[in-house]
Amino acid sequence: MAYSIANNPLLRKNFAKIHKIIDIPNLIDIQKNSYKRFLQLDTPVDARKNSGLEAVFRSVFPIRDFSDTASLEYVSYSLGAPKYDVEECHQRGMTFAAPMKVKVRLVVWDVAKDPGTRSIRDIKEQEVYFGEIPLMTDNGTFIINGTERVIVSQLHRSPGVFYDHDKGKTHSSGKVLYSARVIPYRGSWLDFEFDHKDILYVRIDRRRKMPATVLLKALGYSNDALINYFYKSEDVKVGDNGSMTKIADAELLSNQKATADIVDPATGEVILKANRKFTKAAIRKMSEHGIKEIPISEEEVVGKVASHDIYDPATGEIIVECNEELTQAKLEEIIQKGITTFQVLFIDNLHVTSSFRDTILIDKIGSTDEALIEIYRRLRPGDPPTLKSALVLFENLFFNAERYDLSAVGRLKLNYKLGVDVPLDCMTLTREDILEVVRYLIELKNGKGNIDDIDHLGNRRVRAVGELLENQYRIGLVRMERAIKERMSLQEVENLMPHDLINSKPVSAVVKEFFGSSQLSQFMDQTNPLSEVTHKRRLSALGPGGLTRERAGFEVRDVHPTHYGRVCPIETPEGPNIGLIASLSTYARINEHGFVETPYRVVKEGRVTDEVRFFSALEEEGHAIAQANAEIDETGRFAADYISARKSGEFVLVGRDELELMDVAPMQLVSVAASLIPFLENDDANRALMGSNMQRQAVPLLRADSPLVGTGMERVVARDSGVSLVARHNGVVESVDASRIVVKIDEDQYDATGTGVDIYNLIKFARSNQNTCINQRPLVKVGDHVTAGDIIADGPSTDMGELALGQNVLIAFMPWGGYNYEDSILISERLVKDDRYTSIHIEEFEAVARDTKLGKEEITSDIPNLGEETLKDLDESGIIRIGAEVRPGDILVGKITPKGETQLSPEEKLLRAIFGEKAGDVRDTSLRVPPGVEGTVIGAKIFSRKGADKDARTEIIEKAEEMRLRKDEQDEIRIIRDSAIGKLKKLLVGKTAAVKIEGTDGKVLIPKGAAITEEMLKSFSMDRWDEISIADDDTVDEKVAQTLSTLNQQIDIIKYVFDDKVQKLRRGDDLPPGVIKMVKVYIAIKRKLQVGDKMAGRHGNKGVVSRILPEEDMPYMEDGRPVEIVLNPLGVPSRMNVGQILEMHLGWAAKGLGWKIEEFLDKNAPHDEIKRFLKGAYNNPDMDRFLDKLEGEELLNVAKRLKRGVPMSSPVFEGASEESIQSMLSHAGFSTTGQVTLFDGKSGDKFMHQVTVGIMYFLKLHHLVDDKIHARSIGPYSLVTQQPLGGKAQFGGQRLGEMEVWAMEAYGAAYALQEFLTVKSDDVAGRTRMYEAIVKGKHTLEPGLPESFNVLIKELQSLGLDVELLEGDED
């Protein structure tokens, strides 16, 4: 049990005051859930939802031929088992993928002469192989060609309708022009916009604009219908004497002025004086007095617009047309003709403008047909329009589900914005939608409604892996559809089977391209567990269909109020991608529509409940949300009357009864990386950003050391990252060694197919994508009981199941001899000596033997012209032995390549004569160690062609692997056999035998009627136990027979699985064409901390090691302990990352408590005293109960674990207060200032002032000086310019640029400069002569023409300028 006690989360003292309501959701669920929804593997075929892959197939099929005589219909798809498992794919450079089969049905029809009638002639159904589809590993990654990749989720603009204005920038007058845009998921964009004359225009797919009424008329609406849809009308009555009144409509009257006194007809009382506004009170008074009509003057009516045609009652002819302005003459004609009522449009040019009416006036198109033809002309200029083709084009634009898809999200957003109620499965636009879009735009211009904020997270959604791949599949299937249609029309369909029609190559090609080279398919950042988790949780606004760096402005990159709890405001890259790449917050998840949701606790009547609901940014609008740290009394009510809350993106004070929601935790605001920074609340945001980003670059160290001051997130990250081994079932540890753990599962945990044994093979010294070392170490001992979910082995950068990126080091803040000027770091030699910051890096080198035109390359140790000393570490196969220490230039794999027959020089002829033929016709092309690599060979893998002879080394490797597999097989069989024996003994011992059992020699082993004992059972083989029969109890016989048959079945399964693995092992490998053999050699490089390495704390406090000082010269404390790192105090105030100081103080207290516990252990203090001290330090009732249960050895185990310091957890935004830190310091026996007196290590003098000393968690980053330092003697040259290449990877030279040339000129160093620009760079002939001169011991320089000068001349000649070099005398 020691394991579970030492691993108890309670041992980390927690300063959080808010109890946890919900656990943090699994950190990589964003990837796993999306892919699960895409594949729907666990769902039965007939129960699959219309989403993901299923939706793609259903949308593209059925495919019909052009004459509609045959159709290819989709039935279902299924996935087979992957050919190689994850580990094998890593080793062989394969893709981890499953073969996909699609069941399709080909239906052939007989078409009769009568139109519309047809009968089925033939139906054929068949499963067709459809290529491979990559599978996701358990850790949310994909293995493509042997490397682990992550598909980053994309944040893009959600489909739907968006309203915006140009902020007055388009027109010189500064007038604000409004516009609306309908964006579908796929299909044509529709834009409506006003110009500066207030005319409404429409664009389709950003083509030329036309009046919006053209589009509306094409939908089938007439001028009258449109006018009356967008405007309200007023009824005007004409009296006998020609006086006019209008009907009092309360809705239209508000905000208008009375033109004459409004008088109560009964009493004559003036209710509203002329030129006064119709207020609500006035309108109410009018209705009380029964006033239904208001007098209106002729001047007011003149200039109004008729809302309907006005007819002459006698003749029926039209006096005024709809949308015609009433003139004085027309008005007089109306009165004269005796028309008593007519209707005019309500346009006051204040709240209702005449813009739509003006648009109708400039639009000269009368009918729907004309409108359709006009749209056709605009979209297809040059094509002769016909009414039919125009109608088809228009219908296809917005109303055909195959061409236009709003998606469920788009429909949801459209319904939400326009207030319509169209079912979510209607994914195309409706005519009403378009009218409503225009209506909202007109109202927006008239001052009602709001424009949309495109950076609001309700308008941006996430496309995760599943959806990105779904889109790729659709592209592939559409390409395939074209090919199928062509094949159907070219060949006789009735003679074909479905597989003759389907060629899945286009689909496979698209998927392969997506995983291999899409901007969103990225090489996984595998530096440490945190960087893996963060990479999988990343959201990118870049990528296909997203933004580009150059076009993205400040607004898109900025933090938005809706990011709260959804997207981290801190973690984003520095540089050109800032704000475009973000990280999901800790508690956030993505809903089925792709919107980011965050959890809140529900508040009912001022009382906070434990009910948790997830809200997207749109759903949260308008709710008042309290902070997680708002004070609550014991009944769950808010303590204060007014609470600081967030509402619609603003911080407001709200009465407690108005609150509806409350945050679940203070750290729901930030991402995983930021939540690992203790005292984040005391750091400046810029430095917190650097701290988050640099934690991802921390190199896994040789000895992981979890932080003394953490935040409580360390365990969560280690568990979810997948680098640690997590127990699958409850059980007891049977055996443990460095490379595997065997757990016997508890009986109540057996599942139907399981064998009762879990074998965990640990990863040993594997190479990560970033060349860091992945190694797992067991944490459990034989006999330990483990529970499902326990961490049983640590991975890289984890310590006892907690993330451990760096080391806890003793730090002093003081200047020291200028060695910590400008963020430099002075470190003690002690850190190097103890290997505290030593890391292991693994490099992989590959040698390939190919079949060339001149013959086969050969991997061998027999290499011409090399001495014994050079080949001493190669075995007879030519491959270096494991354990060899290699340096740059050493041979890793010996390889010779045949070389073509050439004219031999006299020296070569002599060599031939001495050494025979062999030396001449091959050349040495061995794989050698590149410069800058020095280490130990830790492995070699050999891949040979199928059918090729295996060399000795391959056979040794295969044997070792086979033995490992056999051992697993035997252990599994032994454990399940033992557990079966245990069960059978329970059933049989003590029961009475009904028949006697005899041995092979006739000896009676169990007499009839005897009570069965264990000895009797041991005396013969278990296979015969089913012969035993029990008197008076038939059920026992049945149970025995059943147990034995189950056991045999399980053993058969195990043997089958292992035999299959061995077969795979012995088979040859699939190598690329032309490759005979491939050898991979792995070298482990041990990197100690050295001058030039970059280090950092968690608060953005980074620096470079400037000097490694002997331990005795470091400043030391009064008790003689030297500090380990000295940092510059000037690095703190201007950077404003004070969190590091608080972390130091708390770490100092934690270390002090550890030293006290060590004192107790050293003096063998009574257990009660140790318990008392621990209870005082933890001050936590749960911990008190835990400590009370511990006795003797268990208590000592805990004390030993705490000797290195009592780990603390100071969660983000609810960390330890100043008072808590001071009380911890005094409990540890330190000064509450956190400062101590230091002495100079060199002189022994006391420093003048006290110095802040404490424990800070410090990381070594991946920017190691060994990887950066580089020198070149002779190396490759560029083909065109003949100048040396640049960069370490190309083994390049140092560039001497324009400015450096000026500097040399300024110093008058003419000869040095001539050398730089000619023989040391691109004077080809000159460099050859220089080489010869050096060989002969002469020191002469003959510069010639630089090659780049020739390039310049050729370039001028290509422009048609005849440039020639004239050779001649200087005159």
From Swiss-Prot:
Keyword Transferase carried by entry: yes
Pfam family, one: RNA_pol_Rpb2_6
Keyword set includes Transferase: yes
Enzyme kind, highest EC tier: transferase
Catalysis performed (reactions): RNA(n) + a ribonucleoside 5'-triphosphate = RNA(n+1) + diphosphate
Sorted UniProt keywords: DNA-directed RNA polymerase, Nucleotidyltransferase, Transcription, Transferase
InterPro entries referenced in this protein's UniProt entry, alphabetically: DNA-dir_RNA_pol_bsu_ext_1_sf (IPR042107), DNA-dir_RNA_pol_bsu_external_1 (IPR019462), DNA-dir_RNA_pol_su2 (IPR015712), DNA-dir_RNAP_su2_dom (IPR007120), DNA-dir_RNAP_su2_hyb_sf (IPR037033), RNA_pol_bsu_bac (IPR010243), RNA_pol_bsu_CS (IPR007121), RNA_pol_bsu_protrusion (IPR007644)
GO terms for cellular component: DNA-directed RNA polymerase complex
GO molecular function: DNA binding; DNA-directed RNA polymerase activity; ribonucleoside binding
Enzyme Commission number(s) of this protein: 2.7.7.6
Single biological process term from Gene Ontology: DNA-templated transcription
Superkingdom field: Bacteria
Gene3D superfamilies: 2.40.50.100, 2.40.50.150, 3.90.1100.10, DNA-directed RNA polymerase, beta subunit, external 1 domain (2.30.150.10), DNA-directed RNA polymerase, subunit 2, domain 6 (2.40.270.10), RNA polymerase alpha subunit dimerisation domain (3.90.1800.10), RNA polymerase Rpb2, domain 2 (3.90.1110.10)
Role of this protein: DNA-dependent RNA polymerase catalyzes the transcription of DNA into RNA using the four ribonucleoside triphosphates as substrates.
Entry-linked PANTHER family: DNA-DIRECTED RNA POLYMERASE I SUBUNIT 2
Family: Belongs to the RNA polymerase beta chain family.
Record's subunit section: The RNAP catalytic core consists of 2 alpha, 1 beta, 1 beta' and 1 omega subunit. When a sigma factor is associated with the core the holoenzyme is formed, which can initiate transcription.
Protein name (record): DNA-directed RNA polymerase subunit beta
Organism: Geobacter sp. (strain M21)
Lineage, top ranks: Bacteria, Pseudomonadati, Thermodesulfobacteriota, Desulfuromonadia, Geobacterales
Gene transcribed to yield this protein: rpoB
